[in-house]
């Protein structure tokens, strides 16, 4: 279960049971304490941030705060270096990678020292790349050029651009 769902479930359970004084003394058997004891220390601290240090806050209000961030909330990286995720020991904690050499490969960061590099996919027709053009840092490309009528490109491939020699599928945004 993801942390967000665990915390949401915990706060929902806490809304039905009012926990007072301390969060779950040893031997407590409430549903809240059962779920709370399954969380890691970091997750327990996050729950206490929402419902108070002694878990005496209003769990319904805390749950509404959680729901407010839930649909669009994303976290990249970790607060501490974790070496059990298959990363190299000296890797950046803000590095995030989904997949590995698959067609649906998604990577943020780590492209020859360019911190703003973002790549979706590999070099197939639905390839999408932001950044990493040799001459232009504002380069943006959708698709591949090789005889694809759906190719779409933002930016110039050469410096001597001539406005009069536009192709039929020319597309420009801005001046």
UniProtKB/Swiss-Prot annotation:
The keyword Cell cycle does not apply. Residues 22-68, 79-86, 157-165 form a propeptide. Residues 1-21 form the signal peptide. GO terms for molecular function: neuropeptide receptor binding. Each flp gene is expressed in a distinct set of neurons. Flp-1 is expressed in the AVA interneurons, the M5 cholinergic pharyngeal motoneurons, and the AIA, AIY, AVE, AVK, RIG and RMG neurons. May be processed by convertase egl-3. Its main location: secreted. One of its GO terms (cellular component) is extracellular region. InterPro entries: FMRFamid-related_peptide-like (IPR002544), FMRFamide-related_np (IPR051041). It holds the Pfam family FARP. Keywords: Amidation, Cleavage on pair of basic residues, Neuropeptide, Repeat, Secreted, Signal. PANTHER family: FMRFAMIDE-LIKE NEUROPEPTIDES 1, FMRFAMIDE-RELATED PEPTIDES. This is FMRFamide-like neuropeptides 1. It comes from Caenorhabditis elegans.
